[in-house]
């Protein structure tokens, strides 16, 4: 068998030349300005309307409502609702996730509800050159953000993978960055994945198929970070506005945001506090940013990759940080996360991604800026 020797220096030169050729941008793509910065607050009104088809006997619904309050970047300003059922707010005791629980009696053939929430949001950015003195995590909060969940364990293959990724990293910042780069390099956004994915990171790692959507890829980031001893958490929500930085893939196309759910993630770093991290959106840019299927060295991808470790745009509503959520009044299984409206009729959980039987719309409009 013939062997081939490769001169590493020549290979590097060839690779750089090829990369430069591929990366030559058009004038428009060369002038990318993706720089989220904390500034003016933007206020949005978000309306979720649900109508449950084929209602049989007792029917219930659970609608996530904003429960996140972070003084630097997000404020939940309250929710109101109308319904022909009986409604009350419910909380997940462990995570603080909040939902509107609505019940309809037997015989109500046309269950309907409408929830209106107001939120204020703004951009985030971390200056890694200027560490500060953020409040340390309380022991209970630190423990909860290092603990495994049903879909995000921190042992076994997750721990083994994390150990390999962070080998040689000396600080939490280095570990967090190494995991981010690994997820960006080794995963992909799979257009065939339903919804935002199910977040089963063990199945991903065991199969070797690291494709999925945000609830998969960012959950993988969180699991790997927690396994490395770095507190991390998912933040479940929905995009509510176009990107002001020209990314079609990172914003909405209209006021109808029914399918704009998006899970982001955060990692807690000494000197910086909770830091935004979103490797899944880097892979979304690769797959979906026009003209689609971009190369990793495309300027739009490079800008997203640079920015989304440490910053994100405030065109998005945060519902909660919850995992393993039991829906009050339901005998069905726990949810891995609560990001979509949920419903049951006659004791059967409806498919929240089935528009025929679990009909809902979500709309968003900006009501003030500044």
Where are these regions (language model features)?
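Short intrinsically disordered coil segments
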Residues: 77-80, 129-138, 279-282, 336
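N-terminal secretory signal peptides
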Residues: 1-10, 14-24
């Amino acid at each position: 068998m013939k062997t081939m020797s490769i001169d590493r220096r020549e290979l590097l030169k060839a690779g750089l030349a090829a990369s430069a050729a591929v990366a030559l941008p058009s004038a428009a793509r060369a002038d990318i300005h993706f720089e989220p910065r904390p500034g003016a607050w933007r206020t949005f009104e978000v309306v979720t309307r649900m109508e449950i088809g084929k209602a049989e006997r007792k029917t219930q619904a659970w609608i996530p409502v904003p429960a996140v309050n972070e003084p630097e970047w997000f404020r939940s300003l309250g929710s109101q609702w109308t319904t022909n059922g009986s409604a009350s707010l419910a909380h997940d005791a462990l995570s603080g996730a909040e939902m509107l629980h609505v019940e309809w009696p037997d015989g109500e053939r046309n269950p309907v509800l409408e929830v209106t929430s107001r939120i204020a949001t703004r951009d985030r950015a971390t200056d890694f050159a200027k560490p500060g003195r953020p409040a340390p995590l309380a022991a209970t909060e630190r423990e909860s953000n290092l603990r495994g969940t049903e879909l995000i364990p921190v042992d076994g293959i997750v721990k083994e993978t994390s150990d390999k990724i962070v080998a040689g990293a000396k600080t939490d910042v280095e570990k967090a960055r190494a995991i981010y780069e690994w997820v960006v390099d080794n995963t992909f956004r799979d257009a065939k994945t339903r919804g935002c994915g199910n977040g089963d990171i063990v199945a991903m790692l065991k199969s070797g198929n690291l494709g999925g959507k945000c609830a998969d890829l960012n959950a993988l980031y969180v699991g790997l970070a927690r396994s490395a001893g770095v507190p991390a958490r998912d933040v479940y929500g929905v995009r509510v506005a176009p990107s002001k930085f020209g990314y079609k893939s990172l914003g909405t196309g209209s006021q109808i945001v029914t399918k704009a759910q998006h899970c982001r993630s955060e990692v807690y770093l000494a000197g910086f506090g909770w830091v935004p991290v979103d490797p899944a959106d880097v892979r979304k840019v690769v797959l979906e940013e026009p003209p689609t299927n971009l190369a990793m060295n495309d300027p739009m991808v490079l800008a997203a990759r640079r920015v989304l470790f440490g910053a994100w745009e405030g065109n998005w509503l945060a519902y909660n940080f919850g995992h393993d959520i039991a829906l009050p009044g339901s005998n069905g299984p726990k949810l891995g996360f609560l990001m979509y409206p949920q419903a049951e009729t006659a004791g059967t959980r409806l498919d929240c991604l089935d528009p025929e039987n679990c009909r809902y719309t979500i709309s968003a409009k900006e009501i003030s800026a500044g």
